[in-house]
Amino acid sequence: MNTIFHLASIGALALIPTVAGETTTTTKLCVELEVPVPVRATNQLFDQPRVDSTIDAIDWTVWVSTRTTPPVTERLLGNKTIDDKFLINAQLCVPSDKGPKADILQIATPGLGFDKRYFDAEIQPDEYSYVNAALKKGYSILTYDRLGTGKSQKPNAYDIVQIPTEIEILASLTKIARSGKLISSSKVLSKSSRTISDFVPSKVVQIGYSFGSFLIQNVVARYPELSDGAILTALYPNTIPYSQMIDVLHYDHEFPKENDPARFSEYGSGYFVLSNEADLQKLFFQKKSLDPALLTYTEKIKQPETVGEYASEGLSSYLVADNFKGPVHFFIGEFDNFVCRGDCRDIYNQTEAERIFPHSNPTYYLQPETGHAPALSKNASAGFEVMLGYLDSHNL
């Protein structure tokens, strides 16, 4: 895997309060939507093996990490222009009592291996649901399944589900939300007993997890006018040399239809999924903050990834957000195995953080005893307080 998933950690955290503003009691009012999202992007065609079985999936991980495999820049076959609409499954939740933060919309983007349920766990939601935590502080929040995951559309895994497409999906979804036409332009799939109406948010804050955080970094750099702030979790600019970073060979993958034929029946060639709970523990968790029930839940909600995402990673990087002036906060597990080779202490790269966010005064926070999935670890609710406290301290 490339540096985009390992870079992280911007400036020491400046006096974030332990309690984020005033907590309110609120009923969860949500509407599930199928959003047609227009996308124009330039993807790449790559020379690479096909993945049509678990044998292929394992062989692909070996091939892509073999020292003599040509770099991605030498495997380019040309451009592929994407000009289409994709059906994205999303959930908009608003507080039942309209307070001063109700018109601040958070948009949460999950990472590889997850859909929007990463932010809205069904197990002990008061502890593990970031959606619930945000609503209790009076925010509105939009979560969505990235392309190729959950209930969203599952197109070609080689040529369409790539990083450029996913960046533009987030940008377009943000534009639709800011226009006040999110609900009216979508198909309503289910809703709470009380009707939720379209509204024009006064501010938009991007909340990312891992790969989702990287997408957000690119979106705020390309489209600075769309967002007013960002919290990037499980992403951390650091000083680990590229040669020491963990690559995809550390984790076993299977062809989705062979891993779970019923659950993954829609997934075709080019998709693969993490094999089992052991792989999920290695990637996402640390023993001290691991609740076995959450590990089982993670296995239940895990999502496939695509060959195209990994291939396009080799052509992707952080962009300098010259025109973005909103606050940025990096939030990382103290012992994130994936980003920091198991220990994120004392490796924060402030120079890199300030290079990519020169006008955002970026800060960082290490969530104690936590791995790569802080929202699904035992101390999740304490971490949510830190994140929401950061927003409150910046008038968001």
Model-assigned labels for residue ranges:
Residues 1-22:
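Fungal secretory targeting signals
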Residues 22-101:
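N-terminal cap/lid segment of alpha/beta-hydrolase-fold proteins
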Residues 57, 65-73, 245-344:
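Alpha/beta-hydrolase
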Residues 96-142:
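Short, surface-exposed "cap/lid" segments of acyl-processing enzymes
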Residues 159-198:
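Alpha/beta-hydrolase active-site loop
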Residues 199-240:
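Conserved hydrolase catalytic core segment
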Residues 334-370:
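Conserved loop-alpha-helix segment in the C-terminal half of the alpha/beta-hydrolase fold
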Residues 367-380:
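Catalytic histidine-centered segment of alpha/beta-hydrolase-like enzymes
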